[in-house]
Amino acid sequence: SGLQFAVLDGQGFLPFPRV
């Protein structure tokens, strides 16, 4: 991932940027 908004990622909701 690498988004700045909370989005449904492979590990769940990421409310912050992640690689």
From Swiss-Prot:
Keywords: Amidation, Neuropeptide, Secreted. It comes from Austrophasma rawsonvillense. It is found in: Secreted. It comes from the Eukaryota. The modification Valine amide is found at V19. One of its GO terms (biological process) is neuropeptide signaling pathway. This is CAPA-Periviscerokinin-2. Mediates visceral muscle contractile activity (myotropic activity). Its main location: secreted. Belongs to the periviscerokinin family. One of its GO terms (cellular component) is extracellular region.
